[in-house]
Amino acid sequence: MSDFEPFYDVKHSYEDNYEQGPFGAFAEALKATPSVTSGDSSPYEGEPGKKTSAGAEEKPEEKTAVGAEGEPAGSTFLGQPVNLPFGIPAGPLLNSRFTTAAFRMGFDLATYKTVRSRAWGCNPFPNVLAVHPKSADGSLIPGSAELDEGVLADTNYEQPISISNSFGVPSQSPDVWQPDMRAAIAAAGPGQVLVPSFQGSRVEGMSEEEYIADHATTARLIKETGAKLMVMNTSCPNEGHNRLLCHNPLLVGRITEAVKQEIGDIPLMVKLAYIPSDDDLELMVRSTVGHGTVQGFSTINTISAKLVDADGNQALPGAGRDRSGVCGNAIRGAGLDMVARLAAIREKLGLDFKINGVGGVVSPADYQAYRNAGADSVMSATGAMWDAELARKIKSSIK
């Protein structure tokens, strides 16, 4: 990997990264092409569109994908033309400064960090630690005893890199993220797509119907930014001990029905964690794609593990943080497995949906492995954080 400083600085808080980032090569990319700002524009914008007399942003002109050499002509992501169906998933791109820098570094899919219908705080610092599985290749196996016994986590960031992801899905309030998302959308170049991510927010005393409605409200708020597609996160919301929203396919199906009523024909992708049962995974597909509410799945997010320090104590401070999602090199095998199983279900059921492969992509070979497994598009978070040139390397490898 390259020697670039990570564009998200793990030595600083989420709040500091939001205000001061991105860093490293991403920061240099923004300096190389100064943004054009105006008084009523977002403080985090890249290259905003023209403003109308009323202050509203005009829709940018249609941008034509140029295509990456070696890729099939007419590559798309949920119907939108892309140069290369590769980018960065929800997580490290905190605002439009980050997404704009990602575009300029050649990542043609840039996912705006998951937003909510309300402001939501971040877990205490630190949020990211280096994770060191025991296996020779550094991989974690879903369901293995190691995940419950404890995996070493510290500040020794070694290659191949695996890290904790313990943020709690923070969000700005809509009055902050909506104008910033508009600017992020406008900053996309030809063949590039801003991918908004969202999730519902469960608060104390909320009924299931209110929880479903909160998803629909957040999707509507994204639609108001002019987004042409969106991803709904079902891989983080905690529905109980070690139980995620995506472990309840029938509820996800009900939620996507409500979301689709709000967004209409705008394509919807659902983000999944690792689902070990083929029957449960097929039920997820039948409950969503089978009802016409979902056009794709993005998988995987992380693998949950108990993280410990060298003395066997809880690595991340605070109540309820004995476990964390792990991402990076450690989860590539699980990600490839999920993609291949989803592709097999797609073939079995004869349903048309897209698969976005995520997890442990740190090299051009990893990108190709996901495509070979059945992914229509691929994204990298940890790999991209530690190698800002990753998209360019993948494009150079395709002949």
Language model regions located:
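Active-site entrance/lid segments in N-terminal catalytic domains of soluble metabolic enzymes
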Residues: 2-17, 30, 34, 96-292
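Glycine-biased, low-complexity coil/linker segments
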Residues: 45-47, 68
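N-terminal amphipathic alpha-helix/helix-capping segment at the start of soluble metabolic enzymes
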Residues: 70-87, 178-186
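Short beta-strand/loop segments at the ligand-binding rim of alpha/beta enzyme cores
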Residues: 81-87, 189-195, 263-273, 345-357
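Glycine-rich beta-to-alpha transition loops that act as phosphate-gripper elements at the mouths
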Residues: 90-93, 197-201, 272-276, 352-365
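Glycine-rich phosphate-binding active-site loops on the catalytic face of alpha/beta enzymes
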Residues: 112-118, 296-303, 361, 367-393
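C-terminal helical cap(s) of enzyme catalytic domains, especially alpha/beta-barrels
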Residues: 122-137, 308-323, 383-399
